[in-house]
Amino acid sequence: MCIRDRAHHLLNTRQVAFIYHVKADPAAPVQSIATVSETADDVLSGAGSRYGPVAPLTGLLAALDRDAPFAVVGKPCDLSAIHNMAKHDNRINKLITHRLAMVCGGQSTAQKSREILHNAAIQEHTVTLYRHRGYGLSLIHI
């Protein structure tokens, strides 16, 4: 079962109230942001590999403040950081009932994505969708 399917299952069986993960930034699709998905459709719209820098735990405290069980999807280093945070915040082990890790090949830089755009003669501000995997590298721009 892939991570997306596992997240759908957790939501559909009401084991969690939401999934905390990253997705493409709607305002800048080459970049990524942390997000909360409450439905399978939300998870699907945010699914897909994201390469480049992202601060995946920026909204974690707000997610914990919702006081509802949830799952986190992240890189192993993100989940390790959450494990370490649990030593200082007992809500983590109570509320984060599932931690889903993906295989990580290491951190990439945003410069790699910009180089791809440059080589394709596409200006970043014209990009409306940027996918790294799942459909091959997909760029949609205006």
Language-model regions, residue ranges each:
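Iron-sulfur-associated redox domains of electron-transfer enzymes in respiratory
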Residues: M1-H141
